[in-house]
Amino acid sequence: MKSKFLRLLALFLTIGVVAASCGSDSDDAAPATTAAPATTAAPATTAAMATTTAQVEVVADGSLLDTVQARGTLNCGVSGSAVAFSETQADGSVTGIDADFCRAVAAAVLGDAGAVNFVALTASERFTAVQTGDVDVLMRNTTWTQSRDSSVGMDFGPTTYFDGQQLMARVSDGFSASSQVSDVDGAVVCTNVGTTTEKNIAEAALLAGAEITLLGFETSDEVYETFIAGGCDITTTDGSALVGRKVKQQPADQEWVIFPATPISKEPLGPTYGQNDSAWADAVNWTVYAMIIMDEYGITSADVDAACASAEAEVGRLCGGEGELQTGMGLPADAFHQVIKQVGNYSEVYNRNLNPVGLYREGSANAGWLDGGLIYAPPAR
């Protein structure tokens, strides 16, 4: 037991330093030491990410909310290569659930869901981009952790997707959906170098008594190319990313399986922004909460106009009716009406982006609280 503890301590000290210095999640993006893959480039129709704070218009002594409204555009940091979360398409458009949450914030703050400049960021670029003002908010599969909340200078909004790290292997190698980490003894595991994914799998294998060989790669594309070619037995990252890659890249002559059923880590993903700006945090957070509340009432983009025309109580307030609280937040009274009308409620955004890759709310942590899940919003009153 003492020997295992000492090995675990050494592992934390070695891998923890690398992961902290890179600031990277298990999030399907390249570390800062390499150029981002072509698919992560910002859409051609939008401006490139600013490289100096001099390029960012800032309202003196005001909230970022004032800055964004004066600018008329939301600069939203995304991955650009995360399947079903934020993918830059051939025509320059950006699709995915993260991209839709960017649009929702733009609809609330600016009245126009299309007023978004999507900025593709690598894992190591993302926090710097927020700190320098190059982006206003991250909607970029970024895990909420204690260190990021306390020492990196970030604040985190509501969790929009509850994820967890899992492993993926070939059925032909003897793995199944019921496999456990202890079953990977002797395996070669591919993952992104210098990430929390690397740290998590090394720790989990050690605790399970499994000896593994870790192969680290600078980009996720390299990870999956090596896995497909048979250069490693297993790949590991967030479960949602594995599902997306399986749908998009599994060869016809291979069958991939994801395990264990219970993830080896907790990965709460949601909006991230600079710390100590309550007005901006309120605008971002309540955009998400409004989408969740309207979902609970069954109000969708198709019927929100009719619902708001006669709504009372909580829905009426969110629609901008009597007792509304949006103007006191620095938003238009109908801010959340526009969010639902232009983008949709939480289920609409989730279903159109994640259902096609096999990620369903039912029975998952991402179900609403009334359905046994963790998606929940405080009352709008």
Which residues make up each language-model segment?
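C-terminal motif of bacterial Sec signal peptides marking the signal peptidase cleavage site
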Residues: V17-S21
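Bacterial lipoprotein signal-peptidase II cleavage site
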Residues: G23-P31
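Extracytoplasmic small-molecule ligand-binding "clamshell" domains
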Residues: V56-L138, G372
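Bilobed "Venus flytrap"/periplasmic-binding protein-like clamshell domains
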Residues: N75-A84, V94-V109, T143-W144, D163-E225, ...
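Extracellular mucin-like PTS domains
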Residues: A30-E57
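Acidic, polar ligand-binding/catalytic clefts
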Residues: R103, A107, A115-D183, S240-I264, ...
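Extended ligand-binding regions for polar small-molecule ligands
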Residues: A50, A54-V59, D100-R103, A107-V109, ...
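Short helix-initiation/N-cap motifs at beta->coil->alpha
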Residues: D61-G62, V116-T128, S176-A177, L214-A229
